[in-house]
From Swiss-Prot:
It comes from Zea mays. This is Zeta-carotene desaturase, chloroplastic/chromoplastic. The lineage of its organism: Eukaryota, Viridiplantae, Streptophyta, Embryophyta, Tracheophyta. Its EC number is 1.3.5.6. GO terms for molecular function: 9,9'-di-cis-zeta-carotene desaturase activity; flavin adenine dinucleotide binding; oxidoreductase activity. It catalyses: 9,9'-di-cis-zeta-carotene + 2 a quinone = 7,7',9,9'-tetra-cis-lycopene + 2 a quinol. Residues 1-16 have a biased composition (Low complexity). The gene is ZDS1.
Length: 570
């Protein structure tokens, strides 16, 4: 799930005063600087483009390129927006009937909006906020109370309350010291561990701290945290729910780099921990505006077209280049050609797409060492208000929505994070005369993948009642289950070096996706950032790609002439 540091005009620094829940993470915006030349990939540009928030690119002055993008998820669309802004021609090919990828949604026959997961926008999603502002979607986010809320069995509430008159890092320090989610001893040990982390260095040397964080990729967060004095209880009651919400795996199995990246951002950016959620469904309020921006500028979407084969050749001098893509839609087949090809896939998708021969390159072979994490998203519609804990009578009326309006964490259920979308994203999810729409993310999803939907729904219902005893007696009037076999890539210790760069050994073939190399974690922000990096590489190779286009035209012409001569001779 998702989701940056920000130059945002999206919302005020503090949310409106209404105590409610949250969860969070993300990176601070970098100081703006002028990007390097557009047609030359200089070391300066490469260095800058690896930042969490790259500077704005200069206006591209190279040749206009035709670019084909495989995948219309957030990474593919981010790439398309950047390329169209630089004057290129862009086509996006998506095998599904809807766009958005892991942040997509669709409407079923009964008019219900079905999401691929629960999407939360951390205050450090600078690149995503930049994209949303560019496409006119920045007003589609609702700011939540600046607290992260933990719902424990029996309906007791624990909080990390970041509301404080003074910003980072003091607002975070007081939140951790005052939290009622941990006992005094665990809070003290938690404070010691964080004091011994790169978080402290980040206050005076953010770049140095991030490098120190990168160097901790080989160790799990649990091992690192406990080696610094943290307790197992802190992990179980606080950090595991947060970690499951972010990457769908627990602290024992996640790289310390991932968690410490988030901590570093929280320590240096007041808004990093401030959560936002969409007004309604992603298809309407996120993907929709991006799609309109793309099509208004001449970009084209081709839905239900899947790429079956990457057609490539190797020149006598050993250089490999793509000559086209074989696409299919039902019984139709088509070969499309472009100057540059972008694979904006998830981990299982890129593994299926890459020609097996390309594994001779270490960069491509390393991709096969990555795998995705299974996740199950459940939606439950009730005939009352599940998260209303104060007033039983209010929880039974259906005239107005009541309850906790935020992202919620729990350590006491198989779903680590959840939200009542009828409250938190009401535009599409509040229905007059109906109650809560609980959307819960089951992590780890492995035990639930083989189960029938009815059994999954039954298990989740029981756990909801354990968290909210006051909801006993409410009925589920509608439900849905979405299973994704491989979602975010598994950010296990030692996996970061296997993430590929967006530029590949194949001259006109590029990668985009949140799993690719960038300084943020696999998330909506990571996907958006990868698209910016991909576009920068393509623009930097503009003259080279033009030369390749001319070479291929000559080669095709010579082959066609040769075929004619053969026919004439026969």
């Amino acid at each position: 799930m998702a989701s940056v540091a920000a130059t945002t005009t999206l919302a005020p620094a503090l949310a409106p005063r209404r105590a409610r829940p949250g969860t969070g993470l993300v990176p601070p915006r970098r100081a703006s600087a002028v990007a390097a030349r557009s047609t030359v990939t200089s070391p300066t540009w490469r260095q800058r483009s690896q930042r969490l928030f790259p500077p704005e690119p200069e206006h591209y002055r190279g040749p206009k390129l035709k670019v084909a993008i495989i995948g219309a998820g957030l990474a593919g669309m981010s790439t398309a927006v950047e390329l169209l802004d630089q004057g290129h021609e862009v086509d996006l090919y998506e095998s599904r009937p809807f766009i958005g990828g892991k942040v997509g949604s669709f409407v079923d026959r009964q008019g219900n909006h079905i999401e691929m997961g629960l999407h939360v926008f951390f205050g450090c999603y600078s690149n995503l906020f930049r994209l949303m502002k560019k496409v006119g979607a920045d007003n589609n986010l609702l700011v939540k109370e600046h607290t992260h809320t933990f719902v424990n069995k029996g309906g007791t509430i624990g909080e990390l309350d970041f509301r404080f008159p003074v910003g980072a890092p003091l607002h975070g320090i007081q939140a951790f010291l005052r939290t009622n989610q941990l006992k005094v001893y665990d809070k003290a040990r938690n404070a010691v561990a964080l004091a011994l982390s790169p978080v402290v260095r980040a206050l005076v040397d953010p770049d140095g701290a991030l490098q120190q964080v990168r160097d901790l990729d080989d160790i799990s967060f649990s091992d690192w945290f406990m080696s610094k004095g943290g307790t197992r209880e802190s992990i179980t009651r606080m950090w595991d729910p947060v970690r499951y919400a972010l990457g769908f795996i627990d602290c024992d199995n996640i790289s310390a780099r991932c968690m410490l990246t988030i901590f570093t951002l929280f320590a240096t950016k007041t808004e990093a921990s401030l959560l936002r959620m969409l007004k309604g469904s992603p298809d309407v309020y996120l993907s929709g505006p991006i799609k309109k921006y793309i099509t208004d500028r001449g970009g084209r979407f081709h839905l239900r077209w899947g790429c079956r084969e990457v057609l490539y050749e190797k020149s006598p001098d050993g250089e490999t280049y793509v000559k086209g893509l074989l696409l299919t839609k039902a019984t139709s087949r088509e070969i499309i050609k472009a100057d540059a090809y972008v694979a904006a896939c998830d981990v299982p998708g890129i593994k299926r797409l890459l020609p097996s021969e390309w594994r001779e390159w270490e960069m491509f072979d390393n991709i096969y060492k990555l795998d995705g994490v299974p996740v199950v998203t459940v939606q439950l519609r009730y005939n009352g208000w599940v998260t209303e804990l104060q007033d039983l009578e209010k929880s039974r009326q259906l005239q107005r929505a009541v309850g906790l309006d935020n992202l919620l964490y729990t350590a006491d259920a198989d779903f680590s994070c959840f939200s009542d979308l009828a409250l938190s994203s009401p535009a599409d999810y509040y229905i007059e005369g109906q109650g809560s729409l609980i959307q819960a993310v089951l992590t780890p999803g492995d035990p639930y993948m083989p189960l029938p939907n009815e059994e999954i729904i039954s298990k989740v219902q029981k756990q909801v009642v354990e968290l909210f005893p006051s909801s006993r007696g409410l009925e589920v009037t509608w439900s849905s289950v979405v299973k994704i076999g491989q979602s975010l890539y598994r950010e296990a210790p030692g996996n970061d070096p296997f993430r590929p760069d967006q530029k590949t050994p194949v001259k006109n073939f590029f990668l985009s996706g949140s799993y690719t190399k960038q300084d943020y974690i696999d998330s909506m922000e990571g996907a958006t950032l990868s698209g910016r990096r991909t576009s920068a590489y393509i623009c930097g190779a503009g003259e080279e790609l033009l030369a390749l286009r001319k070479k291929l035209l000559i080669d095709d012409g010579e082959k066609a002439l040769g075929n004619v001569q053969v026919l004439q001779a026969s």
